[in-house]
């Protein structure tokens, strides 16, 4: 998700095509082409410019609705429905996941090309966390560059959030509290405070504190690797 303002001018974008198996956007005002995954202009008058990212979550509607009960949902375009077109089905990822990947000779086979990864970029470093790793172990405590982070899998076993795990200069270690009916809960070893999936402490010495959110990009391995060639992969090790 990107801000649409460049040099004080609001740009309007349309889908223009695909480059390296990733969407290209074209702005009406200058005709510049922008790469969707990076927000960078790759052709045209604004080539080399970078759109400013807007923080967002990629979570299930059920989790979003539970956290934002008064939230609004974008209404479907009536013109699309009237023209007989259909919106992408809810299980579109299952279909896409079975599609073949057109790749060059430099294929990184450490993971299957359609393996879903949660990509984190911090401190000039990029790390790919396979969704399957989080489904086996959550939370994941890690360092991305010099930044201490924690990744948490939601109750739906599909939504993932990441946070910097430092409070007042102190690194926190987390484990998931089990046997509770009140939703996902994490406890930090240092203070015993209890935290929710939003990264907010609601009980204990740190009650009311909020962990700093870290952007997580849900992507296929082949695409993440293409735009983050120096990425590492988080490894759970033998299990």
Labelled PLM ranges:
Residues 1-239:
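Mid-to-C-terminal functional-domain signal that highlights helix-capping/loop sites
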């Amino acid at each position: 998700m990107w801000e649409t303002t460049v040099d004080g001018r609001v740009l309007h974008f349309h889908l223009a095509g695909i480059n390296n198996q990733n969407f290209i956007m074209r702005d009406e005002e200058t005709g510049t082409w922008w790469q969707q995954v990076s927000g960078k202009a790759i052709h045209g008058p604004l080539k080399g410019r970078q759109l400013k990212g807007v923080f967002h979550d990629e979570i299930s509607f059920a989790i979003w609705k539970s956290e934002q009960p008064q939230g609004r949902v974008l209404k479907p375009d009536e013109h699309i429905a009237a023209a007989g077109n259909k919106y992408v089905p809810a299980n579109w990822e299952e279909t896409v996941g079975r599609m073949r990947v057109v790749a060059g000779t430099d294929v990184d086979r450490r993971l299957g090309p359609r393996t879903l990864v949660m990509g984190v970029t911090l401190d000039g470093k990029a790390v790919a966390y396979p969704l399957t790793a989080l489904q086996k172990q959550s939370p994941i405590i890690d360092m991305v560059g010099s930044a201490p982070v924690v990744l948490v899998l939601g109750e739906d076993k599909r939504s993932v959030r990441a946070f910097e795990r430092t409070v007042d200069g102190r690194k926190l270690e987390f484990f998931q509290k089990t046997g509770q009916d009140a939703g996902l809960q994490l406890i930090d070893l240092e203070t015993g405070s209890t935290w929710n999936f939003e990264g907010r402490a609601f009980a204990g010495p740190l009650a009311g504190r909020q962990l700093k959110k870290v952007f997580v990009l849900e992507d296929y391995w082949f695409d993440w690797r293409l735009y983050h060639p120096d990425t590492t992969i988080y490894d759970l090790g033998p299990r």
